[in-house]
Amino acid sequence: MGLFCINTGKVKLSQAGFEGKEQIIRLAKDSDILGYRALISGEAYSATATVIEDSKICLIPKEVFYELLQHNSKLTSGIMKLLADELKDAEDKITNIAQKPVLERLAEALLMLKEYYGVEDNDNSLNITITREEIANIVGTATETVIRLMSDLRKEGMIKLDGKRIKIVKSDALLKLANLYD
């Protein structure tokens, strides 16, 4: 048991939900750390981490992590901020799933992927290869629903699809659709 540091790559964290359906709870990338919540709480980590692109990951043993926390107040403050940010994200996700229609959640998820992973310089495609099923697991809906709604977004000219690659064409329209304008 220890703290996992993603040097390079992309990882999805998921949990089995109702009837074993995968729910993606977090996406991680370069410089992210995983496992700190379980280390701090002393409980087993309840999520499964799956590498979705080639990655280099290092492990900091539990004892070393505890020692660093005890002697480095900046690290301790940083971990506390990460925990607070994760709690806020979880609260926002609960509210979204409870109150937003699926299309709004999908638009927001696509924008989140764009913000988090960025886009390719040459064509504004998301800098992540992701399946429709994985998007459905982020949004909290059926894969078939995501396929249909993404087809609708493509027809409306907001996105372009090329296999597992997604190009954001009209970010402003997605922002409006997701009700993210102030």
Please name every model-derived segment:
Residues L113-D182:
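Phosphate-/nucleic-acid-contacting segments
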Residues V11-Q23:
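A short beta-strand-loop-beta hairpin characteristic of the jelly-roll/cupin
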Residues R26-K88:
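Cyclic-nucleotide recognition modules
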Residues M1-S14, D30-S31:
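Glycine- and acidic-residue-biased ligand/ion/polar-headgroup-sensing regions
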